[in-house]
Regions:
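Beta-strand/loop substructures that line and gate deep hydrophobic ligand-binding cavities in soluble
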Residues: 83-141
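Glycine-rich portal/gate segments that line the openings of hydrophobic small-molecule binding cavities
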Residues: 39-86, 90, 141-157, 168-172
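A generic structural signal for beta-strand entry/edge sites
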Residues: 1, 48, 75-77, 99-103
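Well-ordered beta-strand positions in beta-sheet-rich domains
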Residues: 5-7, 63-65, 90-92, 107
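Hydrophobic-ligand-binding modules of eukaryotic lipid transfer/binding families
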Residues: 1-11, 101, 130-133, 137-140, ...
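Hydrophobic ligand-binding cavity/cleft-lining segments
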Residues: 1-42, 46, 169-173
């Protein structure tokens, strides 16, 4: 299994990050110019809810549906875990209150965890069938950029400039 984690300290109140999370369906698309769709099919992001993300990064079209498997929230912490329908991708967003604002962590994990067969399947998935989409550096760079955008959103209320959809879709695979 491949696990990528990017974290950032944001000098904005935890309440701002929690409000951003509470409006996730709308905020996901505004978060990055590469994010083009987010559908909360149940209207919320509670555990068991169905969700769909779509983003196009460097011409690669990532269109993923799945289920929220964990959703914890209190006055000092939130954690939301998404599992793809194919059960080969997990995305975790976690926020914590700090003395200077909030800490945000974004983790994306890919692959099967089943002993022996998991390693074989991961090789086939990542090295044979989906080699272009399994570009770990591209995914990590996108996560870093997402964190930078979130920093600007929560500290300055500044959203990134949108890229026209037709431009994003040109050559998307």
């Amino acid at each position: 299994m491949i696990v990528l984690t990017e974290q950032i300290e944001i000098p904005a109140s935890y309440e701002k990050s929690k409000a951003w999370t509470a409006n996730f369906e709308e905020e996901f698309v505004k978060w990055s110019p590469y994010h083009i769709e987010c559908n909360l099919y149940n209207g919320n992001y509670n555990a068991g809810s169905k969700i769909r993300f779509r983003e196009i990064v460097m011409g690669l079209d990532y269109d993923v549906t799945g289920t929220i498997t964990e959703c914890e929230q209190d006055e000092n912490h939130f954690r939301i875990v998404f599992r793809s329908d194919k059960k080969t991708a997990f995305i975790t967003f976690e926020g914590k209150r700090t003395k200077t604002g909030c800490h945000f962590s974004h983790t994306e994990a890919f692959g099967m965890t089943t002993p022996v067969i998991g390693a074989i399947m991961n090789f086939l998935i990542f090295k044979v069938f989906f080699r272009k989409k399994a570009n770990w550096q591209l995914i990590r760079d996108d996560m870093i950029l997402d964190n930078r955008y979130l920093y600007d959103i929560l500290t300055e209320g500044k959203y990134p400039e949108r890229i026209p959809l037709d431009k994003l879709l040109t050559g998307a695979k």
